[in-house]
Amino acid sequence: MKAMNKVWVIGDASVDLVPEKQNSYLKCPGGASANVGVCVARLGGECGFIGCLGDDDAGRFLRQVFQDNGVDVTFLRLDADLTSAVLIVNLTADGERSFTYLVHPGADTYVSPQDLPPFRQYEWFYFSSIGLTDRPAREACLEGARRMREAGGYVLFDVNLRSKMWGNTDEIPELIARSAALASICKVSADELCQLSGASHWQDARYYLRDLGCDTTIISLGADGALLITAEGEFHFPAPRVDVVDTTGAGDAFVGGLLFTLSRANCWDHALLAEAISNANACGAMAVTAKGAMTALPFPDQLNTFLSSHSLAQAMTVK
């Protein structure tokens, strides 16, 4: 099934070194934005990646991964003077992960407003706070969001907060606020809400992004699914149960499934959002069943099989 409107993804792409056995690692493509783009394209969506990589082995490897998965790389720039990002994924026994960055800043932080393509009405633009950590990528993300809204398109901002990547964490609140004000939809995790607001419980901070100017918030709750907050109310969407191997990229797969579904229509309403979140929950669940952020990102037949074999509880109105 082909998406009707193009999804533009800007930001990070990296080579992830994932533990395989003692003293050995799997070389896996990754990066939050790259994962989102590949997920959209694998599902049959039309997706373009806006970014910068080093003209090195890692950069050429990642560009080939994009091409192999059907992602448009017309606006992906390779620069011989820069080094592509490489990181080690540290996994716990239950599949939870943390990251050790071997290259920072990576080439992805050098994407600039000059790299942006022209946008069209009803298209989508995705960015996350990872793209806001350094200049000129920060300006590229914010300007891209502004131009997409000006063109009559939509913007999805994923908070995806990684404080260790910031040189000055005091910049975070203002940049999150600017991003939320530009966004049609904001996606945030429960933990991130607590980090941003200082609240002990995410429920007490669930309106944080709405209060910054974004009317639609999706809070990812891991194994508990997702909470949608709109002007119509609050709705909880349970997630399917799976055996967890590696949680790397689960949130990105969630966003990819969400964007793919939303891009199939010119306008979105509650019914389409509900379908999109159900698909997003399924994509996120599938992503954690194998090592590597992209390994288990589904193709359409795999997603359909998963949906038919996992009974998803109906969304529950919370408020």
Swiss-Prot record:
Keywords: ATP-binding, Kinase, Metal-binding, Nucleotide-binding, Potassium, Transferase. It catalyses: 5-amino-1-(beta-D-ribosyl)imidazole + ATP = 5-amino-1-(5-phospho-beta-D-ribosyl)imidazole + ADP + H(+). Potassium may regulate kinase activity. The keyword Metal-binding applies. InterPro entries: Carboh/pur_kinase_PfkB_CS, PfkB_Carbo_kinase, PfkB_dom, Ribo/fructo_kinase, Ribokinase-like. Induction: Repressed by STM4068. Its EC number is 2.7.1.223. GO terms for biological process: fructose metabolic process. 5-amino-1-(beta-D-ribosyl)imidazole binds at D16, G31, Y101, R162, D252. GO terms for molecular function: ATP binding; fructokinase activity; metal ion binding. The active site is at D252 (proton acceptor). Pfam families: PfkB (PF00294). ATP binds at D158, V159, N160, K187, E192, S220, L221, G222, A223, D224, G225, N281. Disruption phenotype: Disruption of the gene prevents the efficient use of AIRs as a source of thiamine. Homodimer. Does not show significant conformational changes upon substrate binding. Phosphorylates 5-amino-1-(beta-D-ribosyl)imidazole (AIRs) to form 5-amino-1-(5-phospho-beta-D-ribosyl)imidazole (AIR), an important intermediate in the purine and thiamine biosynthetic pathways. It allows the use of exogenous aminoimidazole riboside (AIRs) to satisfy the cellular requirement for purines and thiamine. Belongs to the carbohydrate kinase PfkB family. This is Aminoimidazole riboside kinase.
